[in-house]
């Protein structure tokens, strides 16, 4: 597969890193770890000033500050990786595979992905390989491939050529968690996306969420 792969992880998450390395080495996929941001170490005002999130992002009566900071840390991790990749020489022609460090890949991941890639419509910004709460009502565009409607989760996805530029220019500052704002852009036809159906990636049940159970 002619793709570039990064795994977003955080300092001290050795069990997750061993888990991801075992999977990807077993599948023969070269990858790099990307140092993510732990929300507890971020400052709300700085996130607003840097236009990562809006002030309204933190006006959430359902969730406390620790959860909102964890969501912001997740968003910042993805944003910084997109920025890094967009500045590189391969961003114009090589898809970018981004995995979070609890991604559980299908045993036939490489075979299935190699079948999907030629079917992805030209101009697609994001291919969701894992997702939640998706209706799967989108148009079938190829074997195992549908147009996305309103997918959530950033556990595992591919960004197509120029997709990082569109995400960076249209998504920030966020008013909601990053997966919600991405889904909103897709729903409004401001971002072109497809989903793998069925999924190639799910979140591993062996690790608890670092969003809903953030650590210091």
Predicted regions and their residues:
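An acidic/histidine-cluster motif and surrounding catalytic segment
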Residues: 1-99, 103-216
């Amino acid at each position: 597969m002619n793709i570039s792969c990064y795994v977003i992880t955080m300092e001290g998450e050795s069990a997750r890193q061993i888990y991801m390395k075992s999977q990807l080495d077993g599948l023969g996929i070269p990858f790099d770890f990307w140092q993510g941001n732990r929300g507890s170490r971020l400052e709300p005002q700085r996130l607003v000033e840097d236009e990562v999130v809006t002030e309204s992002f933190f006006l959430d009566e359902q969730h406390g500050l620790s959860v909102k900071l964890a969501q912001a840390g997740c968003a910042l991790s993805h944003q910084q990786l997109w920025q890094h990749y967009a500045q590189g020489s391969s961003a114009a022609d090589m898809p970018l595979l981004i995995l979070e460090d609890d991604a559980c890949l299908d045993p036939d991941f490489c075979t299935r992905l190699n079948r999907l890639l030629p079917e992805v419509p030209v101009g697609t910004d994001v291919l969701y390989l894992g997702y939640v709460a998706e209706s799967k009502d989108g148009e079938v565009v190829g074997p195992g491939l549908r147009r996305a409607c309103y997918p959530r989760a950033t556990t595992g996805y591919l960004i197509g050529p120029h997709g990082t530029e569109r995400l960076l220019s249209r998504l920030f500052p966020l008013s909601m968690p990053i997966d919600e704002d991405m889904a909103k852009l897709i729903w409004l036809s401001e971002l072109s996306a497809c989903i793998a159906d069925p999924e190639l990636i799910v979140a591993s049940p062996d690790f608890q969420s670092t969003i809903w159970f953030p650590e210091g």
